[in-house]
Swiss-Prot record:
CDD domains tied to this protein: LuxR_C_like
Molecular function via GO: DNA binding
Protein name, per record: Probable transcriptional activator protein TraR
PROSITE patterns named among the record's database cross-references: HTH_LUXR_2 (PS50043)
Length: 236
């Protein structure tokens, strides 16, 4: 089947998806059919970043923890143009030990070397994009993707994730305690465990303990991912 044939099938699969797992399976299948290893949906609204992806867990922690969205060349290019585009980390300008050089090297080490990105301008100045990435030097389908279908795909992912988030109901074991919620709220505001301890009067180790319990309940591998999940579920 052609790339656009696979794209049409993907849109149908997304419309039938009942949960995030089904969305992830559909996107991963399409990525592999086009020669890519991973996918990433990203929504940036001011300083807030929300993601849904198949990238390695450690990469998300590094990306969000280091505020790499402020220097990410793919994000920068997506703001300048509104069409599907190909990118490669090998073309990013980077010298010495600059943050951009570190970003490029870490991206490549996590299997993100080239890709194709579908960008769309959202409401109130927000931006959304869907990327398919590969560890290879060049895997480019940007020239054969139907632009209208590509945008339709991105919007389908966006709204399906919103619908699923709205339907998500935490079971009793996932309910956060008042102290866990308190520490989570401060974490969502960018406060470290030590700063939260000073603000709340709770011991710093205890703050970390509450965050660890919240991570376990929401199946998050890191505090940045915990905050992202909590925002998606409307908890903070």
């Amino acid at each position: 089947m052609s790339v656009n044939g696979n794209l049409r099938s993907l849109i149908d699969m997304l419309e039938a998806a009942q949960d995030g797992h089904m969305i992830k399976i559909a996107l991963r299948s399409f990525a592999h059919s086009c020669g890519y290893d991973r996918f990433a949906y990203l929504q940036k609204d001011g300083t807030q970043v929300r993601t849904f992806h198949s990238y390695p867990g450690p990469w998300e922690s590094i990306y969000l923890g280091s505020d790499y969205f402020n220097i990410d060349p793919v994000l920068a290019e997506a703001k300048r143009r509104r069409d599907v585009f190909f990118w490669t980390a090998d073309a990013w300008p980077a010298r010495g030990s600059s943050p951009l050089r570190r970003f490029r090297d870490e991206a490549i080490s996590h299997g993100i070397r080239c890709g194709v990105t579908i960008p769309v301008e959202g409401s109130y100045g927000s931006a959304m994009m869907l990327t398919f990435a590969s560890p290879e030097r060049k895997v480019d389908i940007s020239g054969v993707l139907d632009p209208k279908k590509a945008v339709q795909l991105l919007m389908m992912v966006h709204y399906q994730l919103k619908i699923i988030a709205a339907k998500t109901v935490l079971n009793p074991k996932q309910m956060l305690s008042p102290r866990e919620m308190l520490c989570l709220v401060w974490a969502s505001k960018g406060k470290t465990a030590s700063v939260t301890a000073n603000l709340t009067g709770i011991n710093a180790r205890t703050v970390q303990h509450y965050l660890d319990k919240a991570r376990a309940k929401l199946d998050a591998e890191s505090v940045p991912q915990l905050v992202a999940i909590a925002k998606d579920r409307g908890l903070v």
